[in-house]
Amino acid sequence: MANSVFAKLLGQGDYLEYPAADGTSIEPGMGLERIQEGGETRVQPVSTAGAESTLIAREQRNPPRSSTGNPLDQEYNPGDNVESRGFTQHEEARLRLAAGADLATASNATVAEGDELGWYSDGTLAKNQGNPQYEALEAVDNSGAASGDHAVITVKQQE
């Protein structure tokens, strides 16, 4: 299994750090939004379906969160510094696909190569979310997944 969110980068791969908002759990590969909390800028998973965010939580590398296990499986907790990066055209990334049990229509977590994907209201991607921004580069079926069991899917931004 791959161990990095970004599959194809343009440029240096510079990143930004923001503390994770209170009450949030952030998985590498989730879409993020910036909020103001306690007088500082923090991040949380995208909270509106169809949002236009291109800020992505990447796996923590500086320093790594753990010397064992896949960095994509090591989530950020409230207050942790989240390494994030803008996702630009012509790049490819491994982002989180919604679990079927979390969606009103579980089949929106069944993705074929070439399908258009948009943000769901929990920072994951799904079909039919309005305002699709990404194109699936592989087929993944996460329709039978339990709540919170987010798959990883390789995508690129739509042109």
Please report, for each region that a protein language model flagged, where it lies by residue.
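Surface-exposed, low-hydrophobicity beta-strand/loop segments enriched in small/polar/acidic residues
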Residues: 1-159
